[in-house]
Amino acid sequence: MLTKRQNLIEVMKGGSPDRFVNQYEAFALIMGVPCSPFKQTICGGEPVKDGWGVTKVWPVGTPGAFPLHDDEHLVCKDITRWRDYVKAPRVDYPDLAWEDVVNRTKAINREEQFAIAFLTPGLFETCHNLLGIQNCLINFYQEPERMHELIDYITDYQMAVAEQICD
């Protein structure tokens, strides 16, 4: 019988897996990476500001946290001036901050699973968190060049995060 990792590799290369892949079973998700912009919100708790400056709240009776996009909390109020509003979170953390993550990563059986840093949000989510979903979608149509610049900026940040994780 193949390991979870081997089975997924067989699926990816069009080989001969010995069973259906069960979603994320081949991945050991590593949470709590120091340079992650994500900040945990608690159902019914106080609003929390993430590394991008986005304030999120998780009201009781809802399926999860979502950004506050009122005038007080919206990070990027004008896509044509996004550089004035949007500041990427820091990525440079000392080795000591990585110690727990390194130890948890070393404990993963790499024959059985892939080690994967769990980072959220992604590109689109970051855009709509910063702009509000309505403004984000409108700006894709009305200001595609500015949206492309913002996406490049977010991508550069995510690449810097990836470099930190791989180091």
Model-derived regions: residue spans:
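Catalytic cores of TIM-barrel enzymes
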Residues: M1-D167
